[in-house]
Design a protein with these regions (language model features):
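Structured helix-beta-strand junction loops
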Residues: 41, 158-159, 219
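Short, hydrophobic secondary-structure boundary micro-motifs
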Residues: 82-90, 116-118, 162-166, 194, ...
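GST-like domain detector, emphasizing the conserved glutathione-binding G-site
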Residues: 1-136, 251-252, 258-263
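Fungal C-terminal region signature
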Residues: 168, 174-263
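GST-like fold's C-terminal all-alpha helical module
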Residues: 96, 100, 104-211
């Protein structure tokens, strides 16, 4: 069984026996014939479960797309493992408990996910994918995100437990939702960063979300730190590049001014 893209972070955190294939979107690997044979939508994430006795026969593969569906499937598949035993439902036969988790995951898709992804794309990611950045759209999605974060802070999180639905332990919903928020660290590398709220600013007035992120990160701190080190590096690289361009621009402008004064 292998998974491409998120929810690979969940797999790493829980140390599930799943192999992870990295798909380089910036190089268009998700649009190659090889990838499209696996996922005709040409998108990530995708889970592939192979029958290795018939690995050359595509019909013997089980393919699943969409983060929520993949996480639910993995939770059911590995429900008896120590790391995942309570990440779905404390009682694997308790449909109502599972439904509460589904509810949080479904809410996230049209709120946190859509707004955070839109903000990240228009403020940072698009420039690495051959697209154009947009301050106007970045601000639009930032406004939507703030409203969604307020709902997360006041409705989904409480004081009796740091986790969603005030459950005594985390679930796959926590792992799914938290990623799109902490991934906003990439905004440090946006050319619009002075005109947008940073991740720290977004969380400053939302103490429950801060407590929740900290609790989720402690599930497997080494894995968490390694995952987010990559995001920090991407943001730092972009920021360094922007500063270099600004420096060259300032030098060029200064040279023209001095030349003009001599005429």
């Amino acid at each position: 069984m292998c998974v491409s893209s998120s929810p690979t972070n969940t797999n790493r955190t829980l140390e599930l026996p799943v192999s992870i294939d990295v798909v380089k979107l910036a190089k268009g690997e998700h649009k190659t014939d090889e990838f499209l044979r696996v996922n005709k939508f040409g998108q990530v994430p995708v889970l592939v479960e192979r029958d290795y006795a018939n690995d050359d026969d595509d019909s013997m593969r089980f393919v699943l797309t969409e983060s929520s569906a993949i996480l639910k499937y993995l939770s059911e598949t590995f429900s008896r493992t120590v790391s995942a035993s309570k990440m779905y439902a404390e009682n694997e036969h308790d449909l109502k408990e599972k439904a509460k988790i589904w509810s949080a995951m479904d809410w996230y898709q049209t709120t946190i996910r859509s707004s955070a992804a839109g903000l990240s794309w228009h403020a940072f990611v698009a420039q690495n994918m051959g697209g154009a950045l947009s301050l106007e759209l970045s601000k639009h999605y930032e406004g939507r995100l703030k409203l969604s974060l307020d709902v997360l802070e006041t409705k989904w999180l409480g004081d009796s437990s740091p986790f969603l639905n005030e459950k005594p332990h985390p679930s796959i919903a926590d792992l799914l939702v938290v990623e799109d928020i902490v991934n906003l660290v990439v905004l440090k590398g946006s050319p619009f960063r002075s005109q947008l709220s940073s991740l720290e600013e977004l969380l400053r007035t939302r103490p429950r979300i801060r407590k929740w992120i900290d609790a989720v990160s402690r599930l497997n701190r080494p894995a968490w730190d390694e995952l987010h080190r990559v995001l920090e590096m991407a943001a730092a690289t972009a920021e360094k590049k922007m500063n270099s361009v600004r420096g060259q621009s300032s030098f060029s402008s200064g040279s023209r001014s001095r030349a003009g004064s001599r005429l």
